[in-house]
């Protein structure tokens, strides 16, 4: 097993800064492009990350630590952000994400006072029994997944424009 709480927190702390540096100030063309029908653009990915910060990671962690595996924690609607109207700029969304993430990391540090708690078990509504360690590992991998998704979606915008170089661009082969 590779999980290390300190290292996990490093990634979770850096994600908001990474996204802010990469996305702030970009034109709407970059922020609104997607990979086709039923896929998310960059703004929607950020909205999803905000939704997950509010309703997924810390609420589930608290539920596991309070309830254990006797009762399944509430499901998380991964598509909830698509049903909300947003007029916020990308900078406003990134600021909101950063603020909630920093609060969540403070809460994480308060909740996980010792390594033994990483083995606490809860009941996922689909997967059954899960450990805190797995939830936190998923949080990190989720960040990395969506950073990769944003980069891939943005590269897709220029697929036709790169001409024959497409052959050398691995990101366009996914």
Descriptions of predicted regions:
Residues 2-12, 39, 43, 90-94, ...:
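Amphipathic, non-membrane alpha-helical segments in soluble helical-bundle scaffolds
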Residues 21-24, 28, 62, 66, ...:
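Charged/polar positions within long, soluble alpha-helices
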Residues 78-119, 134-142, 149:
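Acidic/histidine-rich alpha-helical segments that form the ligand environment
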Residues 8-11, 23-25, 68-71, 85-87, ...:
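Short acidic/polar alpha-helix capping motifs at helix-coil junctions
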